Amino acid sequence: MSSDGEEGSFEGSQLVSQSPSINSQTYAIPIPEGMLDQLDISSSSSSAGGRDDEDEEDDDADVDVGVGSECLVGVTGQDRLIIGSGDDSDNGDGDEVHDNAHATSDVSSTAELNHVCSEETEDMDNVDEGLLDDIMNNTGGGGFVNGFEFHESEPMFDVSKYVFETLIQAINSADFSESLAFQTKTSAVINAKSLELKQLINMSKDRLVDLQDKFEKGVQTSNRIKRNLKMSREKIQFLNDEFRTNYPIEFNQARDKIIERTIDS
């Protein structure tokens, strides 16, 4: 009867360890069959035996597990109760056998549990370190430290930046030199044209002075000609008067000839 209870408790514990918890909705960590067997023996003996021994053994187990307790994080309270429940109805005849077996297997079960849990924690640490190394390698050595982003400076980036800055400076200097040359050329053309204008202005002034002199001389000449014409007219008038009075026949004949000559022409 006790063997049937042990097999039932073993199957129940194995089913619990390999199936997810309904209440917690988390998966339990798989535990070796030998350890499950020992845990089944210890749980059945503790549930049927004295309560004082069970409290002391639970305290010792909590102290001995220590670091390895992290491996039971996925096991919920209901799973532990199912694992530790066993087959209480079938434990009436084998209480003494279970008490004696528990005394010898308690130390070995806790040691094996600590060893397995320590190995699992080391594996998890190695996996975490590997993931961190992969992430650092994929990001190329860059990341965030205290909220600030840092990047490793690459030499090609510095060289390209220097080259581009040099090209920009050269372009700026070329533009400046081109503008300076254009300004110099423009100023030279303006100076040449201004010199030509000054020469033309001076020539115009000289010509105006000459024209003014000629005009003044022409005025004087015209005035002199007017005076001469006036004197000549006066003399002709005087001669006509004299010829008309003193020589009227000759004067009239001479006048008729002059009129006929003008008509024939």
Swiss-Prot record:
GO BP of this protein: endosome organization; regulation of protein localization
Major localisation: other
Q: Which residues cross the membrane?
A: none
From start to end residue, where is composition biased (Polar residues)? 14-27, 102-111
Indicate whether Coiled coil appears among the record's keywords. Answer: yes
Provide the alphabetized UniProt keywords. Coiled coil, Endosome, Transport
Gene Ontology terms, cellular component aspect? BLOC-1 complex; endosome
Transport as a keyword of this entry, yes or no, is yes
InterPro entries assigned: BLOC-1_subunit_KXD1 (IPR051390), KxDL_dom (IPR019371)
Which residue ranges are recorded for the region named Disordered?
Answer: 1-63, 79-111
Start-end of Acidic residues biased regions: 52-63
Source domain of life is: Eukaryota
Subcellular localization, per the record?
Endosome
Q: How does it assemble?
A: Component of the biogenesis of lysosome-related organelles complex-1 (BLOC-1).
Q: What job does this protein perform?
A: Component of the biogenesis of lysosome-related organelles complex-1 (BLOC-1) involved in endosomal cargo sorting.
- Cited PANTHER family: BIOGENESIS OF LYSOSOME-RELATED ORGANELLES COMPLEX 1 SUBUNIT KXD1 (PTHR37787:SF1)
Task: Give the protein name, as stated in the record.
Answer: Biogenesis of lysosome-related organelles complex 1 subunit KXD1
From the UniProt record, report the name of the gene that encodes this protein.
Answer: KXD1
